[in-house]
């Protein structure tokens, strides 16, 4: 038995498991500059208050059991007074996906690329399922104006006091807001639910709406920064920060 265990361990050592890819960036941010996060593929996006004058960004990536992590693309740029961080997946590299070989068991993952019909994408190539797990952790100065969007990930924001616009197609949006900081609110979902702290003064509440709509309200008497949270099919939460 000991000899068998030794052989097994030796075999595993000879073929190490691929590790998750971790990408980290730090960027200087001057006072008054805005931040745009366009994080298309995502599972969870966590944004928290950090140090003044700096944005820290971390992405933890696993694509097809870490065999296609090189398909993850990160771009950082500046446009006027805005720092822009964008992520995507390289379509050409995704064509190397091999669910039949166990990279994405059952081929049940999502396909990220052009539209396709009958198993082929817009360029006539056969599409393959891609198993993607990507988490982001972002820290920025508390008063920074932020725009963040994603295809299907959950967005969680806490500790910020500047204007916020957060949108996801099918995930949840969860914002914890400081109790002493006033805000103008717009909370919207089409097929999910909007949950707002009882202290929010709702301006256009509807009872038993047939379809989703934009709920508008104020926090702390209003007059503060604009806060817009939106999900197409997920839930939207506005909470008082504890």
What annotation goes with each model-predicted range?
Residues 4-13:
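Sec-dependent N-terminal signal peptides
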Residues 15-19:
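Sec/Tat signal peptide C-region and signal peptidase I cleavage site
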Residues 20-79, 175-177, 228, 233-242:
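Short linear S-[DN]-x-LW-Φ motif typified by the pepsin-like aspartic protease active-site region
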Residues 22-28, 58, 88, 159, ...:
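Short, surface-exposed interaction patches in beta-rich subdomains
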Residues 30-32, 40-42, 50-54, 69-73, ...:
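Extracytoplasmic
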Residues 33-35, 43, 136, 144-146, ...:
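The right-handed parallel beta-helix/beta-solenoid scaffold, focusing on the short coil/turn
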Residues 61-105:
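Mid-chain, structured segments of secreted extracytoplasmic proteins
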Residues 89, 98-129, 197-217:
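Acidic/polar low-complexity surface segments
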